[in-house]
Design a protein with these regions (language model features):
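Mixed-charge interfacial surface used for oligomerization/domain docking
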Residues: 2-8, 13-30, 34, 67, ...
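Short, flexible active-site-proximal loops enriched in glycine and acidic residues
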Residues: 55-58, 89-93
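Class I S-adenosyl-L-methionine
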Residues: 34-83
Length: 172
């Protein structure tokens, strides 16, 4: 967690979400080391290390459970460590890492603006419901070109507009 952050709760995630280490540090976000390949004991040790740094609660954001076992591993880590599990809030982002990066930015902004742990957890749940990326399996599917005269916006432009719309949202 960034040293300039004086909050009482940490935001952690299971992957860097396409963000650079310096960006994650600026957001005050910690990444569970090797979370996508970790076992429950390693994740439990990571959570304990966060608590030993003086943090009282942890908001732990994870890749969509259908794509990764990291949320299941985090749940097992909480079950194996009942003394700290009540202070950890696990969130299934319902998304791939790109959208999680947007969620991390919003959660960090909420924390910096003084949001309580409970409010940040509720916000994380709300973001998980509304921030979504599309995942399309392309198993030999032939796509046709639209005969529409107006070309549609690229996925990148749509994500940029979504990011801008979410970033300008003054939720808290």
């Amino acid at each position: 967690m960034a040293s300039s952050d004086c909050s009482t709760f940490a935001i952690v995630c299971d992957n860097p979400c396409g963000l650079e280490a310096s960006q994650l540090e600026a957001l005050g976000v910690s990444v569970i080391p090797g979370a996508l390949n970790s076992d429950a004991d390693q994740v439990g040790e990571f959570y304990r290390g966060i608590f030993e740094s003086g943090v009282q609660k942890i908001l732990s954001l994870h890749v969509y459970a259908d794509f990764s076992d990291s949320l299941l591993t985090a749940k097992k880590a909480c079950q194996n460590n009942p003394d700290i599990s009540s202070s950890i809030f696990l969130v299934d982002s319902g998304n791939m890492p790109t959208a999680m990066g947007i969620m991390l930015e919003r959660l960090s902004a909420a924390r910096k603006s003084g949001a309580s742990f409970e409010a940040a957890c509720a916000y994380a749940q709300e973001l998980a419901e509304v921030v979504a990326t599309m995942y399309i399996a392309m198993n030999k599917v032939v796509l046709h070109k639209s005969k529409d005269k107006h070309p549609r916006l690229s996925l990148r432009l749509r994500l940029e507009r979504l990011h801008r719309r979410i970033s300008n949202d003054m939720y808290l």
